[in-house]
């Protein structure tokens, strides 16, 4: 008789329509592995069957929708950190503590808190954040302005408005 290790379940992926556009969520049995912002979400295949990964992806979808509707300030999700190295993970976890809902932190301050000397290195890590929104890289700003954002500055501005960090923009077109 041969013992065969059980096959790991395939990751589950879903795409959900939200107030900011389509968002993709990838989950494994370990937790949420990736969140894809609008423009990126269309590239992920929708997969998964009943099981822990599918349940995790569904829970993430509910929480992301609630957040984007202004009905949730924190996420209660298990995260799969397998796509990031230890330093990157430490920076992202520090970000979650340093910048809760409605609070920003500068690239330089996040660097000081994590021992990363160059704020540009923090910027690179934010651009490679596999879990945007859940790990709030949109709350990291430049010392003299918004800084960049993988989802674009318009989306960053909208998220900061949602959290009350920036005032809503006036609609001067009357639409």
Question: PLM features: residue spans?
Answer:
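Helix-turn-helix DNA-binding helix
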Residues: 121-122
């Amino acid at each position: 008789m041969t013992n065969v290790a059980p096959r790991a379940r395939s990751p589950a992926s879903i795409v959900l329509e939200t107030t900011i556009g389509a968002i993709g969520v990838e989950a494994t049995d370990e937790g949420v592995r990736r969140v894809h912002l609008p423009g990126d979400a269309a590239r992920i295949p929708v997969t998964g069957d009943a099981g822990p990964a599918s349940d995790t992806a569904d829970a993430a979808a509910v929480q992301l929708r609630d957040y984007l509707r202004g009905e949730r300030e924190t996420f209660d999700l298990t995260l799969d950190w397998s796509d990031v190295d230890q330093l990157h993970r430490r920076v992202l976890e520090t970000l979650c503590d340093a910048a809760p809902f409605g609070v920003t932190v500068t690239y330089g301050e996040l660097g000081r808190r994590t021992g990363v000397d160059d704020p540009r290195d923090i910027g690179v890590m934010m651009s490679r954040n596999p879990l945007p929104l859940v790990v709030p890289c949109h709350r990291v700003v430049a010392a003299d302005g918004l800084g960049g954002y993988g989802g674009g500055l318009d989306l960053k501005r909208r998220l900061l408005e949602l959290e009350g960090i920036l005032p809503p923009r006036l609609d001067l077109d009357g639409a």
